[in-house]
């Protein structure tokens, strides 16, 4: 479910979310990929190599659809669309946002007083708040009995909007 909603995770992010060691995560991810639950790709880099990036595979989509009592078509899953994120110009932005939240979730997994109680991607935020605000993510963090709701604005100078213009909608 998490992968379907957030579109793509690196092997390192998945390890942070659910495993104690990267090697264990990579073994499990290889198995899930071989079974068709996940698909993976490795973006091209000019130097070095990128970690594998994982998206929902056809078997994973069928499992998710069955869990929700709908068809794969109703779910809106298409393998080509899932894999197209590999060439999406905003892939680095999605990975930064997912990396931030994966780090919080990983911290919470290792610290019993902490919890990432909510984690919404940009698409879900847009569906909820429309054009009023357009955060890259929303979260609810709990730690030691205190809860904080927050919006993530991930600006790396790639969008033609000033930070003050982006924050204006939050006043409402």
Task: Indicate residue ranges for each PLM-predicted region.
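A generic fold-level signal
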Residues: 48-49, 95, 132
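Amphipathic alpha-helical dimerization/coiled-coil segments
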Residues: 66-118
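Active-site metal-binding core of divalent-cation-utilizing nuclease and nuclease-like domains
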Residues: 41, 86-92, 109-150, 155-169
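Nuclease-adjacent, charged terminal/linker segments that flank catalytic cores
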Residues: 1-84
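Long, contiguous hydrophobic alpha-helical segments, chiefly transmembrane helices and signal peptides
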Residues: 3, 8-9, 28, 54-56, ...
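Short, low-complexity, polar/charged sequence segments that are solvent-exposed and flexible
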Residues: 72-76, 138, 169-172
């Amino acid at each position: 479910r998490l992968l379907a909603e957030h579109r793509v995770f690196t092997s390192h992010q998945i390890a942070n979310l659910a495993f104690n060691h990267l090697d264990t995560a990579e073994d499990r991810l290889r198995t899930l990929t071989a079974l068709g639950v996940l698909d993976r790709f490795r973006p091209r880099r000019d130097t070095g190599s990128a970690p594998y990036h994982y998206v929902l595979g056809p078997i994973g989509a069928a499992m998710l659809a069955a869990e929700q009592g709908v068809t794969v078509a109703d779910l809106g899953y298409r393998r080509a669309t899932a894999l197209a994120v590999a060439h999406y110009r905003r892939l680095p932005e999605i990975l930064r946002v997912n990396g931030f939240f994966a780090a919080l979730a990983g911290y919470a997994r290792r610290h019993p007083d902490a919890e990432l109680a909510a984690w919404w991607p940009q698409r879900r935020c847009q569906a909820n708040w429309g054009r009023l605000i357009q955060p890259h993510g929303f979260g609810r963090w709990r730690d030691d009995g205190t809860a904080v709701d927050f919006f993530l604005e991930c600006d790396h100078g790639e969008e033609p909007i000033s930070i003050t213009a982006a924050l204006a909608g939050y006043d409402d």
